[in-house]
């Protein structure tokens, strides 16, 4: 029966303790029940309230998994929420329902669209794999390549949709006009390899180049203005490139400014927060692991670079030498390219047929220079000893200057040739017009009537392959051949071939093709075959090829990134003269992506110094923007400076290329629009507009600087706030530690408790019969300890010898038990176990639950004094001992403020005549402790105990909020030490504990809480009658605690020698023991007498 009651009480305690933890959730459940019941009755008819309730229920259904409820509660709440939503959602208006449904559908669609778009991001998984194995620096190259691929896709669409496709659809077909027909002398060699390689023959007279497009203002039935579209698209290519570059740079700047600095907790974030727990693929897990390792290596390198010491003088000298070598390399490469271009021009003028090398030597030399020079710069950069990121930027800048120098030297040479071709064309035009205007020459022979002659009609200018029949005679008028006008140009190109725009486009496309071939060759030779050589011949070589020369290749970020910039610069420079060049670049970038990624994953090894790339990559974009600006200048210069070719292109016949705009405005727009455009384009408007733009740029730049400064200040404030927070946390921890140290120092430093304990254990007690009160320093637990002592009048004749162990208990086991920490509930919460320091004394410890073990007195007598050891002290219950002082030590730990009215048992107090407080405990609350054999109690009480007035019962309790608020079990400690021992704070930690039962029962071992069997009611106790004195009083009989003593408590001589060490709490009350029933049945008078007889008198 008691076991069931104990289990019921235990379950009640657990239920009460869980109420505090689930208080918020129970409120939510109760609100849910209330709302459900209110909605069931139909009290809520407000649409707004219904809508809010429905939203609340939907949020609850969405977050039901996160609630700390049981499964039954979750299911019940989910059912109720669904019922409410299904029942009352129809009360809302259809508009609001449609709006909510539409918003939800839009969110779902946007999420699905985002997930769907991610699938179409090209090469995403490939780039992630490369980044995981080679770091963010190598991955930035492939991200940059993918971004350039996107730009070229847009440029291809622009040129293809507005230029190439309209010309193919609505323009004149191939062979219909002279500019779309291959000359007869070139037809035989049009399909030769060298002709195709040099982009001649059929490729020259195709949509690839400028000369194929017609000059008709309108083509097709729709009247599409192809020349105007060609010019506007050419300008739009540069405009779009500028806009997308600036937009990307601004976005990256915002991202880098908005991103939090990860300089704090550098390694903690990488070690503890870097793993992605959504990874379910072993390959992805391997890649993520490699990425984390690389990021840690990057962080380690950053920390090492911060602490690197440098010799300033040597470093400056080495950097000066490195810059001199770089300048010499740049000057040599520029001179070499200019020399090769000039030589090729001279060869074209002096030779009629050129070899394959002579036709392609310019492109080959430029590609060789661009491939070899960056490696030389890489060797030179090793002298400078910069940070790897700074080294990369210097390398990028130098290679950029090299590429720009190569391109500009090439462009200058090409423009010289364009200038010479323009002069020849002008001379040809002037000579032709002179011969036509002066006279007409007749042929020296009569031609057959059916024979057709190539001639020019009078007044039509220079034309070829135009035939017309003479009237009446077969005499044909012809123009003097060009060899008459210029005898030095025997092997000059025909007027149809003198198209400098097509020549520039051919050179740019040829340069791009040869650059691609050299890139493929360098990847195969430098990376692939080198890796094969190192891999398979390292075992047979004289040295280790993998760790020494030539070793495996590393991915060179600087020159590869600059190679992309250089390639895109060639596209921008030649896009106006070759509209299909962006389309070719798209194919080139696709092949480059797959080839480079294969080479990196197969043939390259990670860098020895892996450094973190810039978060924004704005340095790459800045170089690309600079390259765009410099590549736009030659094109703009050619458009403005040179006259378009007369025999090819959509602008033939115009004085300048941009005249097509003014011509279109004059012919296709009203007069007033032309006048407005003329006024706007006048210098009176242009100059103030330019000045206004400069002022606007300056203003925006000032705002940008101020925002940057404020952003820096905000970052510093955040860092200061973080440091202050860390300081506050450190101060709180330090204050807590100091408080604990102070509370620890207070108890051992108190002289009252020390004197009491020393007098209690000394052979000559102090001549003091008063009551001493002591307030414990452990004020955190709300405990006030009172030590009451009654000293004997005469000292003992001799000192006490150390006590010996119990018979039958091994010494090693006893020492082990005395040095063992306490277990159970009090072992984790008691201040006496953890927060207090102790003197190096040997304690015989009585661990008891106040609510389950009655307090009882014992007489202690030494047995076998010569055999007691210094580390253990054993006290045994013996018979009467008139001169031995008796010690009563009662200590309750961790009293709490929170009590429960229906849980804690009532407390009974009495005050005897001497002023001592006596607290009565019923015997039936004890359940756990084992008892020692008891002797029959004394037959009667002392007169002082009989005349002690009783105190009122105290009834105050509060319910426990949680399990930790339950009262801990009080414990009792009886300490013994020699007189010579002092409480040194340095040795307060060496405390030896012994349980009460170990002292008296030897091998008896009991756990902290073991339910004991109920005591038999057959045991008879004397039941003296109660003496009512005014108020109801209870005078209990002699308790079992007095049975240990052979002398009666009425003996004044012995009672005067008793010593009491009392520790009482001031705030808490004893909680009910675990397993006790919470309610007690009403008892009859006889049962009440028996229970009162069972009360145990204890001096507290």
Swiss-Prot record:
Functional description taken from the UniProt entry: Probable component of an ion channel. Molecular function hasn't been characterized yet.
Regions of compositional bias (Polar residues) in chain numbering: 751-793
Matching InterPro entries: TMC, TMC_dom
GO molecular function, one term: mechanosensitive monoatomic ion channel activity
Residue ranges that the UniProt entry lists as topological domain Cytoplasmic: 1-148, 214-225, 341-361, 415-508, 591-618, 701-1100
Keyword Lipid biosynthesis part of the UniProt annotation: no
Low complexity bias locations: 1041-1059
Bilayer disposition of the protein: Multi-pass membrane protein
Superkingdom, taxonomy of origin: Eukaryota
Keywords: Glycoprotein, Membrane, Transmembrane, Transmembrane helix
Transmembrane segments: 149-169, 193-213, 226-246, 320-340, 362-382, 394-414, 509-529, 570-590, 619-639, 680-700
One GO CC annotation: plasma membrane
Location in the cell: Membrane
Organism: Homo sapiens (Human)
Keyword Transmembrane helix in annotation: yes
Residues that carry a glycan: 264
Renumbered residue ranges of the record's region Disordered: 738-812, 929-956, 1005-1090
Residues in compartment: Extracellular: 170-192, 247-319, 383-393, 530-569, 640-679
Homology family: Belongs to the TMC family.
Name of the protein: Transmembrane channel-like protein 3
